[in-house]
């Protein structure tokens, strides 16, 4: 395959590089905890993402325990807009909250189909993400987001109850974070979800 040919060429090119490890794997199937020892205390990600796996790849990166300090991503423009979306917009969702919680995001440039060969049918974009200093990991955040956005048109209260919380516990959680009982997940800023995740620790 073309991917195997590229791998073989790069393997030969970097055969004598002592600080370089080349892996030929499906990223979505790769155990990132096994890769972590190769990366040191900090790492960066540079990727031209296949459009059809953009969301699962980005969610895996954003929820991993890897010490990712910076990312530079080329991806479909529509997917890029989800990183910078505002609460209440159609693009706003779990990926948005995770990215904005942990990273400062810059929309660098837009790329038209004419910049590629063969030409895709969609526009592309380049984003950079820089880890926000002092922001701690919240292991419960992905679970909170999965519950909160499970049914977008339902209230956060209903979604939390569907996830197994009693009405009393759900009400107490929302009150602690200053969230109205009738609020929907798509209308809340990332800080609200961070509060919920911290309260659930």
What are these model-derived regions, one by one?
Residues 1-147, 175:
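Catalytic cores of RNA-modifying enzymes
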Residues 71, 182-184:
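Residue-level marker of motif borders
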Residues 116, 191-192:
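Short secondary-structure boundary/hinge segments and terminal tails
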Residues 125-129, 137-171, 177-180, 187, ...:
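An accessory alpha-helical subdomain
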Residues 197-200:
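Accessory (non-catalytic) regions of SAM-dependent nucleic-acid methyltransferases
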